Structures are given as structure tokens and as C-alpha cells.
Amino acid sequence: MASLRPLVKPKIIKKWTKKFIRHQSDRYVKIKRNWRKPRGIDNRVRRRFKGQILMPNIGYGSNKKTKHMLPSGFRKFLVHSVKELEVLLMCNKSYCAKIAHNVSSKNCKAIVERVAQLAIRVTNPNARLRSEENE
């Protein structure tokens, strides 16, 4: 079976790939880098002074058509069982399956076999599969 291709593959443009960091997180170890909105009355980041770190806002968002799209052109759908693959049957040209991390190796093998029959793409087909020697 040839590798599945998406129905359409638009050019994915990322407007902003840098992480927004918290104000003064570079200065103090106790302040983590995770973004928190500054709420102080005199805060220069909140007041958007020139030369300060940038605050995230709606303008940095991705294009609605390419949001959550993988570089392959598919969107992910998390699969926990073989039964959940039936949902992807009609939209296998736009969605691909991703096997959840808590699925057992036995069920994982069953999912991969069923995926081959239904012509659905999987992002992690080798998840939890060990070689024959180790078993």
C-alpha cells in the first residue's frame, strides 16, 4: 500500500514560533518561564513599553485552515481502541490516527492491523512494539 496523502496540503505559515516568556523570568530563578499575564499597576510589559517583552494576543494566531495541521497535511485524531477507528473511515484524507500513550502493546498491534485494512494513516505505528528477541 502506498503512503496515504492528504486531500489538500496548504502551505502552513507559522506567524510566531518563539515562546512568550514571563516578565522577569530571565532575572530570577524562582520565576518560571511559563507565560503569566502581568497585572501590576506600573508594569511596563502590560503597558506595552518599547523594548519590553511582547504579550501574546489574537494577532499571533495561526490561520484557521491550517491550525492544528501536521506538516504532512493531516490533522491528528487520538485513538484508544480499534472501535474508534471507524470514525476515521469517512475522513481518512484529512485526519490521521495517533495511538494514545496508554494503549497496551496487544491493542496497539490490533489497531495497526486494522488501520492497514481501512487505509488510514498512523503517526506512530511503532508505538509499544518490541522486537521478537526481547519477548
UniProtKB/Swiss-Prot annotation:
Phosphoserine: residues carrying this PTM: S62
One biological process term in Gene Ontology: translation
GO molecular function: structural constituent of ribosome
Top-rank lineage group of the source organism: Eukaryota
Keywords associated with the record: Cytoplasm, Isopeptide bond, Phosphoprotein, Ribonucleoprotein, Ribosomal protein, Ubl conjugation
Pfam families from the UniProt entry: Ribosomal_L32e
Name of this protein: Large ribosomal subunit protein eL32
Primary gene name: RPL32
